[in-house]
Structures are given as structure tokens and as C-alpha cells.
Amino acid sequence: METIIEVSHLEKSFQKEQAIRDVSFEIKKGEIFGFLGPSGSGKTTTIKILTGQLTASGGDVRVFNNDARALQQPAARSRFGILTDNSGLYTRISIEENLLLYSRLYDLSDSSVEEALKFVNLYEERKKRVNTLSKGMIQRVTLARAILHKPELLFLDEPTSALDPVNTNHIYAGLRKLNEMGTTIFLTTHDMAEAEVLCNRVAFLDKGTIRAIGAPTDLKRQFGDDTLTVELLDGKKEIIGKGSGDAKQMFEWMQNNQVERISTNEPSLGDIFVQVTGRELL
């Protein structure tokens, strides 16, 4: 499988502060790769280095088998799309007019604009001026712009952070479809549920360092344990870990016919993040 992104021993410092520490990973063609961590962990810094907006302090970063800084060259820009918190939209014109302007840069037909608007569920609102939009709608417009030219590689920095559940699910479905059509996706998020829904593989980033990397199911198997929820006849619920001393108590409840129901609970990706890093994902 072709490697789209290859990062080796990446370092990034801002004056006396080291934001990224010895980060290495690679992303294969067709993956949805989640870069997960709390605010301030280095996610946005990494995405800016990968797209050539920032220069690394050390290490090697290659995208499409070229130095990442080459993505800032006009010839490379048609190969990737990016969504960040900086919209760069023209606020005094409509959603549709913004996308039509960008479509001209890629020599695209007007139908590509219609398709992108439907992708983000904004076709009916296409005539609205950007300066009248909510934060969530602006985020959807910038996502439409990022996928307008059906890029080979899509960088998404917290893509659903300002969206309601309905539009979030709509975007999830669209991203899966885009991925099925061949787009590789690099996704940063602090939403572990989002990562579980979308990502083939994830990396846990904590204080600028990757603490674990792998498929969500593999990370759960490696670091997590299922628990049992025991519901008693008196209405109480008890959580019991596998191999814990509480198992003896559970068998006593069962022998005394005190148990109404027992269910198995799989750890969430958020639980695994806490297990690996020792901190909550905030």
C-alpha cells in the first residue's frame, strides 16, 4: 500500500517551548487516520507542518513522497484540501459565490459547487451571505471548500467541533463516502467518539509526544479490560473489573439469587486514552 504521509522524529519548538517531541508515524493511501489529544497537545502544530505552513525544527516530514513544504507550491495544491479554524471566506458575498470563486482556481464546473454544498447540507442556504452565518455554518462552508476538488488527501482540524448532532452525522456519512472514493483523511480531534466512528487507526498525542498508535480495536485489546455491570434485585448497580477481587462478591450475589442482570461493558477509546496517558481528555 502506498505511503501518503511519512513523519520521522519530528520536532517543533517555539522559542523555549517544545511543542512536538520525537513524533513518528506514517499514513497509507485510503486510511482515515485520527490524531487525538486535548487542546494544546500539538495537533494543530502538526497539521500546519504537514501542510507546509510551518517548518519543523527537526526530523523529516514527507507528503506524497516530497518534503511537506512542497505542498505550498501551486502545482501541489490541487492534490490536498484542508479545514482549519481560520475560514478565509469572503464575508460580504454568499456561500455559493465563495465556492464558485474557489472552483475557478481548480477549473471546476458549477456542478462541483452544488455537490459540495449538498455534502455539507447547505444547498438550501447557499444564497446566504457569509457574515450572517453561525459558527457551525461557517465550519460547514469551509469543509465544502476543502472537498470541492475531490482531493487525494484531506486534512481536517476538529471538523465537527461547532456542529449539532444532525449535521455531525451528515458530515460523518459524507466523509466515509469521500474515503470510499479514494481520499485519504488526516483528522485531528479531541472527540474520542468521533474517532471511533471514523478512523481506521489513531495516535494518542499528549504534551507533544505520541503515547500510543494503532487501530481502535487493537488499542482497546492492548490497554483496556472489559467490565461487568451487575444489576441487583434491590436496584443497585455494581461495576466489576475482570480479575478483580469483586468477582467473589458477584458469585455470592448469584448464589443468594440477588442478581437481576449482568452485562459486559467494552472500554471506550476515551477510557483507553486515560489508561495510556493518565489524564482526562479535555
Per-region residue spans from a language model:
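Short, charged/small-residue-rich alpha-helical element at the C-terminal edge
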Residues: D218-L282
